[in-house]
């Protein structure tokens, strides 16, 4: 901005609008004032070296970002092209793959592509020991063992994948809750009373660049939430210490809000006021007191009100029977 009116040239590698400086400049300066001259990107060069179709590959960057975010992309038969931070990144990613039962995955480090010192290193995640140059792009072909962790991006991860004190939105209820929150690319969720963060984590996994803020007054539960976010590939979960509604002051307006506990009229009014147009609100109630509040709000605002009860097969002596969980009353609506 200080140089406005003069011709300024910014040199960037590859395509400046693909995980590069061009996007940041475009947010600070009107794109009408900028002329971009893209060259071959690291992704294009890497795909050509590997013989992979770009249409069938997930591209991501961990350059200057938490490397754990690639965990969410570990899927059987998935091909990944990853911009790394440096020489240690491939070893870290090999460790993530091996820990999750993907040790047979094929890794290829492509260093200094297009230059005089171009080099290639091939190996399996479980035996990766190469010392590679710092300027590299990593190609991964994910190969799952029989005991591999199956972590789909759709909501409904197994409860045992989450650290916690037992107070959490359980698997089947969580799946319906996140579905009704409608995760979308780049959208922001407030998880009010987030506990171990299971809903926020599933929301962030379900859509690329989805964001979430978890509001939780208990330090131990915030620790659980942070650990779960890291382990499940969404390390950018933001956690706020505080009580609702005061903790909501000055937060960015959300596209969706989940209230899993501690419902009150004051909490609802603060959330509803902050929710953006076309925003989604989902509230789960277990107690009679919370259910009564939901009934009153439903009568005033409409939406969808459902009761969900899950029963699971359990051994009863030598036979098997159904053991029901506590019913959950779920209210969802869209702000129009």
Regions from the PLM with identified roles:
Residues 222-223, 291:
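Short alpha-helix immediately C-terminal to the canonical SAM-binding loop
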Residues 196-208:
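Conserved SAM-binding loop of SAM-dependent methyltransferases across substrates and taxa
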Residues 1-35, 44, 209-216, 226, ...:
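Class I S-adenosyl-L-methionine
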Residues 216-221, 286:
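Short beta->alpha hinge that forms the Motif I/post-I loop of the SAM-binding pocket
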Residues 186-195:
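Conserved class I S-adenosyl-L-methionine
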Residues 13-77, 245, 255, 299-320, ...:
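Class I SAM-dependent methyltransferase SAM-binding "motif I" and its flanking Rossmann-like core
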Residues 6-8, 76-166, 304, 308:
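A contiguous loop/helix-start segment that scaffolds small-molecule binding in enzyme catalytic cores
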Residues 268-332:
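C-terminal substrate-binding/active-site "lid" region of AdoMet-derived donor-dependent transferases
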């Amino acid at each position: 901005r200080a140089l406005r009116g003069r011709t300024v040239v910014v040199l960037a590698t590859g395509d400046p609008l693909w995980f590069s400086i061009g996007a940041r400049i475009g947010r600070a300066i009107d794109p009408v004032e900028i002329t971009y001259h893209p060259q071959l990107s690291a992704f294009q060069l890497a795909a050509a070296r590997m013989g992979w179709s770009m249409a069938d590959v997930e591209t991501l960057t961990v350059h200057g970002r938490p490397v754990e975010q690639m965990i969410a992309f570990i899927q059987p038969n998935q091909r990944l092209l990853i911009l790394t931070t440096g020489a240690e990144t491939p070893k870290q990613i090999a460790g993530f793959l091996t820990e999750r039962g993907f040790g047979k995955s094929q890794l290829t480090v492509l260093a200094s592509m297009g230059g005089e010192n171009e080099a290639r290193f091939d190996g399996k995640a479980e035996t990766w020991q190469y010392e590679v140059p710092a300027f590299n792009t990593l190609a991964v072909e994910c190969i799952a063992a029989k005991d591999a962790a199956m972590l789909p991006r759709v909501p409904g991860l197994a409860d045992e994948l989450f650290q916690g004190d037992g107070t959490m939105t359980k698997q089947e209820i969580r799946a319906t809750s996140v579905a009704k929150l409608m995760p979308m690319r780049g959208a922001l969720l407030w998880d009010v009373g987030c506990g171990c963060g299971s809903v926020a984590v599933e929301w962030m996994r379900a859509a690329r660049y989805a964001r979430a803020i978890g509001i939780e007054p208990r330090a131990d539960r915030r620790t659980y939430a942070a650990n779960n976010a890291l382990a499940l590939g969404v390390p950018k979960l933001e956690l706020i210490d505080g009580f609702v509604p005061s903790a909501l002051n000055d937060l960015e307006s959300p596209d969706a809000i989940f209230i899993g506990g501690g419902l009150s009229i004051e909490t609802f009014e603060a959330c509803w006021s902050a929710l953006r147009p076309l925003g989604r609100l989902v509230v789960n109630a277990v107690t009679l007191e919370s259910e009564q509040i939901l009934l009153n709000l439903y009568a005033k605002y409409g939406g969808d009100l459902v009761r969900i009860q899950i029963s699971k097969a359990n051994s009863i002596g030598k036979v098997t029977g159904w053991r029901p969980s506590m019913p959950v009353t779920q209210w969802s609506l869209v702000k129009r």
